[in-house]
């Protein structure tokens, strides 16, 4: 399950401006095996809306990327927050309250038996989910 920062970096891969390790990682995985959480889509939408308010040109470019690339690419591979995910997320909050968005992404991955792909390892470390950081050199 791709975290938001990874989806954003994938945009740079297309432009030839991504981190070299991330580019190498993307070449080593089958795109059909990559999923996003509905929470990741929400975070991307929030980011685009925020940029649109500040910079119309940049906002239009990001809107186009989201609607013409991200949403079609992950059509059928966007995992919802359903009852199982909500319940697993609640268990991640007790006894240690954590960021709800990250907990929902972690819970989504746990329920579906997947890893979280992220640069923000610390945000997911205590959830028990398998974490892959494509910014680090793969062994």
Give residue ranges: language-model regions.
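Structured helix-beta-strand junction loops
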Residues: 29-32, 73, 112, 127
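Acidic, PIN/NYN-like endoribonuclease modules and their adjacent C-terminal/linker elements
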Residues: 106, 110-139
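Conserved beta-strand termini and adjacent loop/short-helix elements that scaffold enzyme active sites
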Residues: 37-39, 81-83, 119, 132-134
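A generic structural signal for short hydrophobic patches within well-formed alpha-helices
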Residues: 7, 41-44, 86, 124
